[in-house]
Amino acid sequence: MRFKITLSYNGAPFCGWQIQPHAPSVQQSLNDALSTLLREDIAVVGAGRTDTGVNAIDYVAHFDYDKSIDTAALKYKLNAILPPSIAIKNIEETDNDFHARFSARRREYIYHIHREKDPFAEQFSYQYSYPELDFDAMN
């Protein structure tokens, strides 16, 4: 059976989504947590890669497992053992031909840029003061 996971994460403590040697990744954290809870090696497939420090909202991944799962209980347990920077929002059984990467219908990228120093925004945005940005040219 195939299971679809929707999650969000703060990418600050990670080298990105994809497993990298000698660096913490979101994928490795999820693999480890699922493998612990389901008591067998689980390999999660993600919708795509994110770079070091990049955050994700409603990121989709999938994994295969041969037994039936109480998805609500698994969500609760995953959120209890994963680092605080990763939040599982939903787990559901899906069709076996669903693929987190190849079944995606769209991806959306949001860039937060602020013009003045703001201690509350610095972790999740980029401060850019000069010169004036040309947003039309950026599109």
PLM features: residue spans?
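Structured-RNA-binding interfaces characteristic of tRNA pseudouridine synthases
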Residues: 1-139
